[in-house]
Amino acid sequence: MHIHEYRVENPTRPITNPSNLQTMKTSNQQTSGSWNISICNQKGGVGKSALTTLLASYLHYICKLKVLVVDCDYPQWSIYTQRTRELEILDSNDYYKLLMTRQFSVSGQKLWPVVRTTPDKAVDEAERFKSEKEYAPQITLYDLPGTVNTEGVIETFSKMDCLFLPMKADKIVMESALSFARILSRQLVENPAIRLKRIFLFWTMVDRREKTSLYDLYDGIIRQLGLPLMETRLPYRSKFNKELLADGTGVGRSTLLAPERAFTADSRIGNLAHEMLTLLQTL
């Protein structure tokens, strides 16, 4: 199996003169059945890169949709780096080789490709990759830095079809997520010249020991603000952060393999993916 990747090495720079949002045009118009999306948040610690990886693998290997991941979270490039680590483990691990062989025989899906780039070049490099490799993804997932002042982040948001904002029951994270969503809604979603159509919030890292009434209270506040909230709530699970290990102890978050069936059900990643697909169909 060949791994497609395209690298752009130029580092990002802080924005000194942000682009005028009113002049952003929909130069990358959506084609039928093809969406640009991003799991994004201003605050760290909500697992946006981990969620991007889990969703990419679930959609690609289980739902059999063609997925492209654009890793522009400079300088970490955590998804690209994870793919590199996993390929190194694969070289010396017959168990994972067997799992991949079985997965390919069932799904017919090769590895989803990852493009490593920077936010200011993200969409252009994704389009170049698709053209050069003749790869037509149905879903392109962009993993962007959490800092909106990073050059190209706002412009890339404007070229998405939909943004999904994870949040957890932490006052600082919630306030940041709600403020972030409201600003993007006013400046991007409500601008008819811009491609971005919707922003959806969803709960992650839900502690099952917390009272359901607490989240219901938060849900009411969010809806009063006029922000769309997804039904799926993701519980906290340590396997969200567990990559492939050389000892072969289970599959949680992997770029090479679909998450295990038990983990998929327990983590509700499958529920989240299918709810996202349903929402995308309404755009």
Show which residues each predicted segment covers.
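Beta-strand-loop-alpha "switch" segments that mediate conformational coupling across diverse proteins
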Residues: 205-254
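Inter-lobe coupling/hinge region of RecA-like P-loop helicase motors
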Residues: 241-273, 277
